Amino acid sequence: MAMGSYLSIITLNVNGLNAPTKRQRLAEWIQKQDPYICCLQETHLKTGDTYRLKVKGWKKIFHANWDQKKAGVTILVSDKLDFKTKAVKRDKEGHYIMIKGSIQEEDITIINIYAPNIGAPQYVRQMLTSMKGEINNNTIIVGDFNTPFTSMVRSTKQKTNKETQTLNDTIDQLDLIDIYRTFHPKTMNFTFFSSAHRTFSNIDNIL
């Protein structure tokens, strides 16, 4: 696969993978979608249980987990992709993982994020700032940011707060681009429904 063509990536908040039937359904879904890379958030797998996640045709599986059944992120790389791993950085509480490698001798960095429910904009901003030396034109950042970037991605049209605006400024300073919003600037699609507030929002992104 040449980087000059395309790289298909899917991302999904799985909300726990401790049930065997759920892991099986996920494996079937990944095989049906057939991407090159799959990023998962909220796996809720403890460090000693990560071996339970298996997908045929996907031997390269990278996890970041906590010692409790909380958070947890995973990056799976398809066997059909000639990916050579160079470095892996894991958050000890399972909120992000970064893998650095190459595809046909072209460097690539993939960061998968699951931001905490409380203080998500500040968390993501601080994480991106701490990693700015690792971020370049071949960096892809994927995940559940737990915060809408703009009022366009809220069903209530609630005004963007100061913390989120500061995060947006950091994203701009790092020359990161919201891929979906770039191609669909006026589309109102949502990835999350809050039953408590009866609102829809888009909190899952690829930069």
Which residues are covered by each model-predicted region?
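A shared catalytic/ligand-binding motif for oxyanion handling
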Residues: 1-207
